[in-house]
Amino acid sequence: MKLTILILEDEPEVRTAVERDLQVFAPTVRLEPASDVDDAWEVIDEISADGDVLALALCDHRMPGTTGVEFLVDMMDDDRTAATRKVLVTGQAQLEDTIVAVNEADLDHYIAKPWDRADLEATVRDQVTSYVADMGIDP
């Protein structure tokens, strides 16, 4: 079983930048990019089929046809992702959206764009560590 980080971002350049900034985790954690919500659910299906777990979802807010907050709320209704740590990475969420993310999606952290690489790495490390501890996984 391998821990996985989902990077849900519709803008290719931004998604690539997040992946690049998280390469430090690649030796021990599976990094899975997704360009939209449908793609994200397909990735989650693949993660489950491989016997791996989704430890962390890094999610943009504004995407075509939906929002990252709606996706994070939907994750709460899926047994495979309800315990996943959830981080909103955006520069466009309104206060109301953020409140919904916190109250209904159990948002664990918020990172504003543009992000600081060291802050992103520290947040990911903290969130994955919290997931491992919460789930009782032996690293």
Q: Could you describe each region identified by the protein language model?
A:
Residues 114-124, 128:
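C-terminal output helix
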